[in-house]
């Protein structure tokens, strides 16, 4: 856990409900600001987490994923502070069983993609609002489908102004980031049953003094 004379500032956003014919879910957000160097000291372990990336099909196949052509620590230390943002998604029928694993995976992909689209857009808007800032998305790139990423053809990214790495791609421990800094335990589906909630962990690197980010 973080050991510091100054505790990170935890902010909690009121619940947001989304009710549509296709789905119903509730979103709850928490955010915390911490010094970048302290966050690196406590949660950065690229030697360990790069191994998980290498086991993923997105490794070296997506421009937002490793390996990178820059030093991640130098990239991070351009900014003095980092906001960690935890977005909890509570499905309205969290105990609902699915007939097959494939149906469950499709549901999860559709739900998380929908929330990611809103969250990524918000983070890019915040970059424009606060100069000298950089977002980290909650997962791999969603601007292109994996098979259409230009990296597969050794070509430059077609969305260089939008693409952002995730914390895990930069080598951070997301499980302990969520539990220690946000008080959120990461949950997963099991036996084709939805968990109580899903969690997206994104971040906002900045040199600005921001009282409330989201």
List the predicted regions and their residue ranges.
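Leucine-biased recognition of intrinsically disordered, low-complexity hydrophobic segments
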Residues: 9-10
């Amino acid at each position: 856990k973080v050991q510091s004379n100054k505790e990170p500032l935890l902010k909690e956003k009121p619940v947001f409900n989304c009710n549509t014919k296709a789905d119903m879910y509730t979103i709850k957000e928490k955010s915390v600001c911490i010094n970048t160097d302290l966050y690196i000291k406590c949660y950065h372990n690229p030697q360990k987490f790069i191994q998980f990336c290498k086991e993923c099909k997105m490794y070296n196949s997506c421009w937002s994923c490793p390996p990178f052509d820059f030093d991640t620590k130098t990239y991070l230390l351009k900014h003095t502070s980092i906001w960690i943002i935890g977005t909890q998604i509570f499905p309205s029928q969290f105990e609902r069983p699915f007939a097959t694993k494939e149906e469950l995976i499709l549901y999860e992909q559709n739900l998380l993609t929908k929330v990611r689209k809103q969250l990524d857009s918000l983070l890019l808007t915040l970059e424009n609002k606060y100069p000298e800032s950089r977002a980290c998305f909650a997962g791999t790139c969603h601007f292109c489908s994996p098979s259409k990423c230009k990296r597969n053809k050794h070509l430059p990214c077609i969305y260089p102004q939008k693409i952002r790495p995730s914390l895990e791609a930069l080598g951070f421990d997301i499980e302990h980031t969520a539990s220690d800094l946000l008080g959120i335990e990461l949950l997963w589906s099991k036996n084709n049953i939805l968990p109580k909630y899903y969690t997206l962990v994104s971040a906002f690197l900045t040199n600005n003094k921001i009282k409330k980010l989201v």
